[in-house]
Amino acid sequence: MIDPHIFRAYDIRGKAGSQLTEDACRQIGAAFGEVLIEKYGKEHPHPTVAVGRDARTHSLDFETALIDGLSSAGCKVLRIGQTPSPVNYFTICNAKLDAGVQITASHNPKEDNGIKLQLRNAEAYSGEDLQDLRRRIETFPSPLGERG
């Protein structure tokens, strides 16, 4: 079960490894991918998402898991690597992508990590949308994304 407390007003954030895990990132990616398919699927059957990360030691693993989730939902991913959040926003707008995800906890302690989600034109996916995403994840069969 995903920790509901990581879903904040403007982003998803928590202690890396306990509150925010690779499995949680995979579930978040899959759920956000479903949202994008529902929102943009008639225009683009496979919405394209820019995914970047900060320099935290766990960000690469979280990025990989989140990309697994997005891909499992049917999204295409443009992996932009280690970048600050504004580069992700620029990429979404400049390349006219459907969405973006940045793995970052910004100014928070190094033990934390987080996820910022954006739609087209780098519009923040936040507020009640994040709570809807959480509820969607809570309906997923458990565990999602385990590999055999």
Predicted feature locations:
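Gly/Ser-rich phosphate-binding catalytic loop and adjacent alpha/beta segment
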Residues: 2, 9, 14-148
